Amino acid sequence: MDHWHAPYLGLRHIPPELTEFELNTFFTFSAKEHTLIEARRNHLYRLALALHLGFIRMTGRTLDAYKQVPKVLWSHLGEQLSIAPPEIGTLRSLYETRPRTLIDHQQLAQQALGFSSMTEHQRRYLVRWLKETLVGRPDPSTLLMQVKGWLYEHQILMPHDRQLKRVIAEAIRSHETFLELSLIHI
């Protein structure tokens, strides 16, 4: 993962001001992704699926229907898909009568990009990785960003920061216990 990508990881909303670079990097699609998008029934669902694909690629997290979508992004997606951009600010109106479609789009986007939810096995592996990362490092303040990078590189959807902080705290406690036991046995 490139260093410039780190600030986007775990965002829960689309930045209101997207640059041309961000639009092209996260919301421009491969031929395979275009095929997946074009398989949707209507224009709005095509735009919505494209939005979900780009958001996961940008943040490593799924987008809910209540977040604002900047007009510049709707325009960019419309241009990408040769569809007139909608005049809606959020996806809420699109999914209001069909909430299952939101979940379907989120799952389709994460599958297309190879992302999945964290399993218990992956959580334990993450704790073990964190304990190794803590060796010789007295300052755990950068761990949250490192965890987000690790999750993205392993194509694991970002849980809420609260859950990530609990995993970090568990790793720190385990590491401190290990250090205490090491000192006792010296």
Please report, for each region that a protein language model flagged, where it lies by residue.
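Conserved small/polar residues in nucleotide/adenosyl-binding loops
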Residues: 184-186
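Linear-motif-rich, low-complexity cytosolic tails and juxtamembrane regions
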Residues: 2-18, 75-172
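N-terminal-proximal low-complexity accessory segments that begin disordered
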Residues: 3-53
